[in-house]
Amino acid sequence: MAKLLHLSCSPRPDSESSAGARVFLDGFRQMRPDWDIDVMDLWRERMPEFAGPIVEAKYARMKAEAFDDAQRDSFAEAERMATRLSLAERVLISTPMWNFGIPYKLKQWFDIIVQPGLTFRYDPASGYLPLLKDRPTLVILASGSDFVTGMNRGRTDMATPYLREALRFIGISDVRFVPIGPTTGPADPILAARETAYRRLREIATWF
């Protein structure tokens, strides 16, 4: 069965990014009712802290050294999470922007799955090479203010370039972003931004 992996990155089920994901998935399910939607809620998912054995496992792997038992167990968790990504034909990431970047749980997910031999490899002649096949990926990114006309005009959106580059590093370059913002302040701009995003999400769902 074809699969879409949804990385749900907000701790609030009624958040703007979560609501946008529901709009998209409603349309996606109508177009592809036979697809499996694998939801990975990063605030409820069992994820190892990127410390201790899993860090040592990463460096052992890079040096082609054998794992000890603790490293083997930790690396198995990274394999489990990376496999869920590699088995998905489509990826949806719904996330808020926090302090111009991404939530720490999403960064933790990247830190865990970006492992040598799992999602990238190193070649002395060519440098770092991705191991995942490219696949359509949609990022719904909600922010309190927009970065064109709102309070954050002129400030740097660090979430979008980070996500684009982190995904490209492991092989995923077919990435589209749908921003939702502003999500705070006067009601009219919020409603207008929401409707613009929802309209685009419904359209993307017809062909994604």
Curated annotation (Swiss-Prot):
Its cofactor is FMN. Transmembrane segments: none annotated. Binds 1 FMN per subunit. It catalyses: 2 a quinone + NADH + H(+) = 2 a 1,4-benzosemiquinone + NAD(+); N,N-dimethyl-1,4-phenylenediamine + anthranilate + 2 NAD(+) = 2-(4-dimethylaminophenyl)diazenylbenzoate + 2 NADH + 2 H(+). InterPro entries: Flavodoxin_fold, Flavoprotein-like_sf, FMN-dep_NADH:Q_OxRdtase_AzoR1, NADH:quinone_OxRdtase_FMN_depd. Signal peptide: none annotated. Keywords: Flavoprotein, FMN, NAD, Oxidoreductase. FMN binds at residues 10, 15-17, 97-100. One of its GO terms (molecular function) is electron transfer activity. The keyword ATP-binding does not apply. The keyword Flavoprotein applies. It comes from the Bacteria. Its EC number is 1.6.5.-, 1.7.1.17. Homodimer. Belongs to the azoreductase type 1 family. Quinone reductase that provides resistance to thiol-specific stress caused by electrophilic quinones. This is FMN-dependent NADH:quinone oxidoreductase 1. It comes from Bradyrhizobium diazoefficiens (strain JCM 10833 / BCRC 13528 / IAM 13628 / NBRC 14792 / USDA 110). The gene is azoR1.
